[in-house]
Amino acid sequence: MQLMKEKQDLTYLSWSVYRNSSGTAGSFLKAYSELGGTKTYYKLSNFDKARGIIGHECVNELIVDRLLTILGIPHLSYQLIHADVTVDGKAHEVYLCASEDFKAKSESKIALDAYKELETLPDESALDFCTRMGWKDYIYQMLVVDYLILNRDRHGANIEVLRNSRKKTVRLAPLFDHGLSLLCSCSDDAAAAKFDVMADKPCNNYIGSKSTWDNLRIIPKDKMPKLTPLHESDRQVLLEGLDGVISQTLQDKIWEMIWKRWCAYEDFCNSR
């Protein structure tokens, strides 16, 4: 079940800060559990000690998960769960996201930027390194995704390398961690209503420039990813069940953003 609205008791989870949020007073908290041999990771949206949840990054994870499923792009699956949690001894009712460990047995993980430092050639760019490793198609798909959702934070640790030293295999983890995207900077409906969904805002990209639009030009015109087209009817799929989780204004604006950017991407492909 991708969306669990029936409230769960997750007060047993122990939360730790994994990133302070930029531009706000909050922070991002994570936890994990190991039940029945399965490791599950949990994340909260932007969290403030005084006010509780002040963001909707976990909802973004679910929406982007659904989007990538429609487009046919491999990715990590997320579950959005209505739950009671305890942070610093205080109870909070939240919507959090959960995902399973994407590492196979005997695999270890390392951030792409750290792996590149170990294996790079002199003066080799991140893109050239990934191309040499045979990962260019993955990178091209990632650049398209990051444009469609305006991913603000595809830094070098937001792409992970999975290594199996026994089998001597190296692969990239499925695309993950898309919370800082879409309208993540909008804390209320007024901000969402004014948000320019096509604005080319600077993003923290490990590969390419800070512009997700300019980064589309990195992809050779004969190498544009073959994606399943998005249709207006897909709005219902992307936003199913989110009434009462996020506002109608936010839902409408998120769809407007995804649809307009998809149309711009199609125009870009057709003009090359």
Locate each region found by the language model.
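C-terminal catalytic region of ATP-dependent kinase domains
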Residues: 166-272
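ATP-dependent phospho-/nucleotidyl transfer catalytic cores
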Residues: 89-93, 98-143, 244, 264
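A broad, structural surface signal
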Residues: 62, 66-70, 137, 141-145, ...
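A short, terminal or domain-edge coil/loop segment
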Residues: 8-16, 128-144, 184-190, 203-215
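Conserved ATP-binding subdomain of kinase catalytic cores across diverse folds
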Residues: 1-110
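Active-site-proximal structural scaffolding
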Residues: 57, 61, 138, 152-155, ...
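Short alpha-helical "patches" and their helix-cap loops
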Residues: 78-86, 157-164, 271-272
